[in-house]
């Protein structure tokens, strides 16, 4: 078994401080546009502060994310299908209400 100090030496020997810039698109073509910019923005992947997208989440939102993360693939697909069906039903209901508003002339601009 390795000693704790030996483990630190081993980990530090694995670190690479080499910078690979994309100065030459011929040598380093960017496979996915924007990935290099994103990687540059993530200078330290291990931070104590939450990411920007989590800053505005409430505890209910985080619980929902945890619940969705614990679902199996089949259950998650079923949840997505249910959300798509709900969105479709809401679209139909909105269409009916807009048609109703058109027939009642409540959506027309007042004539001057």
UniProtKB/Swiss-Prot annotation:
Keyword match Repeat: no
GO biological process, one term: regulation of DNA-templated transcription
Pfam families xref list: LIN52 (PF10044)
Cellular component GO terms held in the UniProt record: DRM complex
Tissues in which the UniProt entry reports expression: Expressed in the brain, liver and retina. Highly expressed in the retinal ganglion cell and inner nuclear layers at the parr stage. Expressed at a lower level in inner segments of some retinal photoreceptors.
InterPro entries: DREAM_LIN52
Entry function: May be involved in retinal development.
Subunit-level organization: Component of the DREAM complex.
Name of the protein in question: Protein lin-52 homolog
Gene: lin52
């Amino acid at each position: 078994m390795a000693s704790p100090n030996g483990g630190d030496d081993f980990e530090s020997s694995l670190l690479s401080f080499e910078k690979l810039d994309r100065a030459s698109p011929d040598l380093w073509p960017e496979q996915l546009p924007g990935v290099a910019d994103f990687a540059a923005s993530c200078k330290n992947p291990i931070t104590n502060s939450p990411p920007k997208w989590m800053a505005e989440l409430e505890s209910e939102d985080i619980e929902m994310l945890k619940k969705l993360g614990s679902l199996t693939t089949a259950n998650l697909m079923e949840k997505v299908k249910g959300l798509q069906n709900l969105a479709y039903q809401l679209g139909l209901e909105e269409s009916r209400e807009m048609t109703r508003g058109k027939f009642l002339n409540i959506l027309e601009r007042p004539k001057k």
